[in-house]
Amino acid sequence: MLTDIVILAAGQGTRMHSALPKVLQPLGGKPMLAHVLATATDLAVRRIHIVVGFGGDAVQAAFPDTQASWWIQAQQLGTGDALKSALPGLTGADRVLVLYGDVPLLTAATLREFLQQTPVTALGLTTASVSEPHGYGRILRDADGQVQGIREHKDCQTDEQAICEINLGMMVLPVQPLAGWLQGLSARNAQGEIYLTDVVAAARADGYVVWPFTLADATEALGVNDPVQLAILERVFQRQQLRALQMQGLRVADPARVDIRGELTCGQDCWVDPNVLFVGEVHLGHRVRVGAGAVLQDARIGDDVEILPYSHIEGAQIGAGARIGPFARIRPGTEIGEAAHIGNYVEVKAAKIGAGSKANHLSYLGDAEIGTGVNVGAGTITCNYDGANKHRTIIGNDVFIGSDSQLVAPVNIGDGATIGAGSTITKEVPPGGLTLSRSPQRTIPHWQRPRRDKK
C-alpha cells in the first residue's frame, strides 16, 4: 500500500491581518507548517506534497532543505481545487492522506492509527463530537448511522446546525477515482468555493465506504484562522511540551508561565521558575536552577549551575557549578568554566572564562581569554574595538584586576599579576607584580566650588 501525503498550505489567512502567509505564522518558535511537515515526515510515506498559493515563494523559501514536492494553486478556489493542483504528483500512489498547514498539533501516532484503521478502498475522514460545533462542517448520517456527506457550516440548514459531530478536515482518499471526484465538484455554495468535503457524497455515489475516524483528543485538530486562535494553540502547545518534560522529571514552578521555542532537554532534578523562555536548542545538566525571567537560547548548561533571575544566555556553554546573574548577559561564543561566577550587570561576549574565576559586578568582557582563579573587579572593561577591528585580551591564572580598570586590547596580563584599581592598561603586564596606571593624587586646599551668578 503506497501512501502519499498532501499538505494544503495555499490559504491567505486574511483574518490574521498579516503580510506573512498563514502557514508561516510561528508556533513554539517555528512556522506552523514546520510542525505539520515534521509530523508528515515521521510517517515515512512514499512522498510528501505541499500545495501553496498566497505567498508561495516565501513559503518555499522558508523550507530550502525539504524533500517535499511543491505545487501551486494558481487561484484560491477552495480546498478541492487545491488538492487538484497536486494530482499529477500522485501517480503511482494507492491513496493520499490530506493534511492542513494550519493544523499543527496533530501527532504522528494519531495519523498512523487513522491510516491503519481506514480500509484500503475506503474514504477515511476525521471526526469529533463537540459541545460547540459553530464554524465546523457537520457530519451527515443516514438512519442507519452511515456517513452520507459533510455540510460546511455556512451551508447548514437550521436542523443541521444542531449536529454536534464535526468534520476535522484530515482525510484519506483512494487515488484511482480521485481525479473524477474532484472534476465533478462545483462551487455552488455559500462561499463560492470548491469544497474538498464534497468528495464524500461523490464517493458514496460510486459505492465507496466512508470510514469515520474519531480523534481521542480533538485538540490535536485545532486550526488557526486568526491571532486569537493562534494564541490559544500556542498555550496548548506549550502545555504539551512542558507536560512531557515534567513527566521526565523537570520541576516547573508554573507551567503556564514558561515557554519553549525550540528543543529543551534536561537532566535530573532541574528547577525552572516563572517567566523563563527557552529558544533554539537548550540543554540543562543535572540539578540546574533557572531563575525567574531568564532567557536561554542555544545554550548548554552544565551540572549544578545556578542561573539567577533575568539573565540572558545565548550561544554559550556554562560549566558545572557556575553561577550566573542576576541580570547577566552571556553572548555567543562564550565558555564559562566550572565554578565561575558572572554577576549582576556583567556582559560577556566571545570570551573564555576559566574555572573558579569571578566577575561579580558591572563589567564588560569581550573577545577575552581569562585563566583560572581570576578576580575581575567591578567596572572592568576589556576595550576590544578600535573603531575598525576587534582585538583580544589575554589574562593569565590567579590574576587580580582592581575595580574600574580598562584593558585596552590587544594586551596580555601574566599569571599572578595584580592590576591596581582605576588603571588603564595598554601594554603587556608581567607575571606576579603590581601594575598601576594612575595620575598622582593631589589636594588643592581652600578650593572654592563654582557658584551661580546672581541675576
UniProtKB/Swiss-Prot annotation:
Its main location: cytoplasm. Binds 1 Mg(2+) ion per subunit. Residues 1-227 are annotated as: Pyrophosphorylase. It holds the Pfam family NTP_transf_3. It is found in: Cytoplasm. UDP-N-acetyl-alpha-D-glucosamine binds at residues 8-11, 22, 73, 78-79, 100-102, 137, 152, 167, 225, 331, 349, 364, 375. Residues 420-455 are annotated as: Disordered. InterPro entries: Bifunctional_GlmU, GlmU-like, GlmU_C_LbH, Hexapep, Hexapep_transf_CS, MobA-like_NTP_Trfase, Nucleotide-diphossugar_trans, Trimer_LpxA-like_sf. Acetyl-CoA binds at residues 378, 384-385, 403, 421, 438. GO terms for biological process: cell morphogenesis; cell wall organization; lipid A biosynthetic process; peptidoglycan biosynthetic process; regulation of cell shape; UDP-N-acetylglucosamine biosynthetic process. Mg(2+) binds at residues 102, 225. Its cofactor is Mg(2+). It comes from the Bacteria. Residues 228-248 are annotated as: Linker. Pathway: Nucleotide-sugar biosynthesis; UDP-N-acetyl-alpha-D-glucosamine biosynthesis; N-acetyl-alpha-D-glucosamine 1-phosphate from alpha-D-glucosamine 6-phosphate (route II): step 2/2; Nucleotide-sugar biosynthesis; UDP-N-acetyl-alpha-D-glucosamine biosynthesis; UDP-N-acetyl-alpha-D-glucosamine from N-acetyl-alpha-D-glucosamine 1-phosphate: step 1/1; Bacterial outer membrane biogenesis; LPS lipid A biosynthesis. GO terms for cellular component: cytoplasm; membrane. Keywords: Acyltransferase, Cell shape, Cell wall biogenesis/degradation, Cytoplasm, Magnesium, Metal-binding, Multifunctional enzyme, Nucleotidyltransferase, Peptidoglycan synthesis, Repeat, Transferase. Gene3D superfamilies: Hexapeptide repeat proteins, Spore Coat Polysaccharide Biosynthesis Protein SpsA, Chain A. It catalyses: alpha-D-glucosamine 1-phosphate + acetyl-CoA = N-acetyl-alpha-D-glucosamine 1-phosphate + CoA + H(+); N-acetyl-alpha-D-glucosamine 1-phosphate + UTP + H(+) = UDP-N-acetyl-alpha-D-glucosamine + diphosphate. In the N-terminal section; belongs to the N-acetylglucosamine-1-phosphate uridyltransferase family. In the C-terminal section; belongs to the transferase hexapeptide repeat family. Catalyzes the last two sequential reactions in the de novo biosynthetic pathway for UDP-N-acetylglucosamine (UDP-GlcNAc). The C-terminal domain catalyzes the transfer of acetyl group from acetyl coenzyme A to glucosamine-1-phosphate (GlcN-1-P) to produce N-acetylglucosamine-1-phosphate (GlcNAc-1-P), which is converted into UDP-GlcNAc by the transfer of uridine 5-monophosphate (from uridine 5-triphosphate), a reaction catalyzed by the N-terminal domain. Homotrimer. This is Bifunctional protein GlmU. The gene is glmU.
